[in-house]
Curated annotation (Swiss-Prot):
The gene is hum2. Residues 1-19 form the signal peptide. This is Class I hydrophobin hum2. It comes from Mycosarcoma maydis (Corn smut fungus). Self-assembles to form functional amyloid fibrils called rodlets. Self-assembly into fibrillar rodlets occurs spontaneously at hydrophobic:hydrophilic interfaces and the rodlets further associate laterally to form amphipathic monolayers. Keywords: Cell wall, Disulfide bond, Secreted, Signal. Disulfide bonds join C33-C98, C40-C92, C41-C74, C99-C112. It is found in: Secreted; Secreted, Cell wall.
Length: 118
């Protein structure tokens, strides 16, 4: 009886742990985003005071908890570029990132991580 209780508890912990987000890269290893959309942003600010200052400079207050960096003035990177037909460096002269969300009608991209452009 005790074995069943211990096993059920361990199985529950394993299920919860596997559902939690990880801090691993959001890329699939070939310059494409596994999660979110590839964006080319004129500014990328790390989470914290820099991000808050950048938003305040735009006259915006952002009350959400930010996970990752924020991207400002971003454009989606075309699929042909992500497929390797055109080098990302030729299309994105600023910072390429993978972002999972957006706010203020797309003005701000949220939960961004750098996109490898090897």
């Amino acid at each position: 009886m005790q074995f069943k209780t211990i096993f059920a508890t361990l199985a529950a912990f394993a299920a919860v742990a596997s559902a939690l987000p990880t801090s691993s890269s959001e890329q699939n290893g070939n310059g494409q985003c596994a999660v979110g959309q590839a964006q080319c942003c004129s500014q990328v600010q790390k989470q914290g005071k820099d991000a808050s200052d950048a938003l305040a400079g735009l006259g915006l207050a952002f009350n959400q908890i930010l996970d990752g960096a924020i991207g400002l003035d971003c454009q989606q990177i075309p699929v042909g570029v992500l497929g390797g037909a055109i080098a990302i460096q030729n299309t994105c002269k600023n910072t390429a990132v993978c972002c999972q969300g957006s706010a203020n009608n797309g003005l701000i991209q949220t939960s961004c991580t750098p996109l490898s452009i090897n």
